[in-house]
C-alpha cells in the first residue's frame, strides 16, 4: 500500500512538472494590435525574438529546453505572422519594441531577459532602451554588425520572397544564414514576406545609434 501511494505521488509530481512546461498559446491585445504569444515553463522570464521574416516557431526546441531548465519562456510572434496583427507600413523599431514590452508587462512576472536572433537583436535592444524597467538583460544571438552591408539585407529579402526561384532563395540563405555543409532547405518554409518588408522599414526608420544606448538605459 505504501509503495502504491509513493508511486502515485511520484506520478503526480511528474505530471505536475510536465504541466508546468506545457506549451500554450494566447493573444495579447492593446489598441488595434494583437500579438500571438507562445508560452511555456515556469521560473525566471525569458523572451525569444526571431530573425527578420521568420516566426518564433524556429525556437521550438530551444524554448522546450529552457522550460525544462526552469525558465518561463515567451515567444511573441512578430506582427503579420500567424495570429499577430498590426500595422506594417511606416512603422519603426519603437513600435515593435512596444509589442514586446506589452507582452512582458501583461505576463506580470518581473523583468525579462530578451534573446534577439539576427534582426531580433534590434528589437531586443530597442525594447531595453524604451522600456528598461521591463528588461533584466539582453542576449544578442548572431547579431548584425554595426555597419550592415546593403547586400546582406538584400539576401534576407530574397530569402523571404516566395516569388524568387527556389534555387536562388537557397543560395541566398546559404550565404547569409548557414555554415558550409549545412542544408538551408529547412528554411524554405516559415517565411513571412510582408512582415519581413515591414521589419526592414521599421529598422530603416530609426537611427541605428538609438539601439546602442540600451546598456545605459538599463542601469
Segments predicted by a language model, with ranges:
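Gly/Ala-rich beta-loop-alpha elbow adjacent to hydrolase catalytic centers
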Residues: 116, 120, 124
Amino acid at each position: 500500500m505504501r509503495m502504491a501511494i509513493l508511486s502515485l505521488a511520484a506520478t503526480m509530481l511528474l505530471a505536475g512538472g510536465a504541466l508546468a512546461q506545457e506549451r500554450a498559446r494566447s493573444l495579447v491585445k492593446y489598441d488595434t494590435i494583437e500579438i500571438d504569444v507562445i508560452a511555456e515553463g515556469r521560473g525566471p522570464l525569458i523572451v525569444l525574438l526571431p530573425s527578420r521574416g521568420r516566426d518564433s516557431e524556429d525556437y521550438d526546441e530551444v524554448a522546450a529546453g529552457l522550460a525544462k531548465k526552469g525558465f518561463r519562456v515567451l515567444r511573441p510572434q512578430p506582427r503579420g505572422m500567424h495570429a499577430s496583427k498590426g500595422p506594417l507600413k511606416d512603422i519603426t523599431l519603437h513600435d515593435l519594441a512596444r509589442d514586446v514590452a506589452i507582452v512582458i508587462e501583461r505576463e506580470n512576472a518581473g523583468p525579462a531577459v530578451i534573446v534577439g536572433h539576427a534582426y531580433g537583436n534590434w528589437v531586443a535592444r530597442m525594447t531595453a532602451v524604451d522600456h528598461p524597467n521591463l528588461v533584466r538583460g539582453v542576449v544578442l544571438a548572431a547579431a548584425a554588425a554595426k555597419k550592415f552591408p546593403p547586400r546582406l539585407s538584400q539576401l534576407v529579402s530574397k530569402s523571404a520572397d516566395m516569388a524568387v526561384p527556389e534555387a536562388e532563395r537557397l543560395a541566398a540563405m546559404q550565404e547569409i544564414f548557414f555554415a558550409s555543409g549545412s542544408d538551408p532547405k529547412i528554411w524554405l518554409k516559415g517565411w513571412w514576406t510582408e512582415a519581413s518588408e515591414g521589419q526592414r522599414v521599421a529598422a530603416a526608420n530609426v537611427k541605428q545609434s538609438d539601439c546602442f544606448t540600451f546598456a545605459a538605459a538599463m542601469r
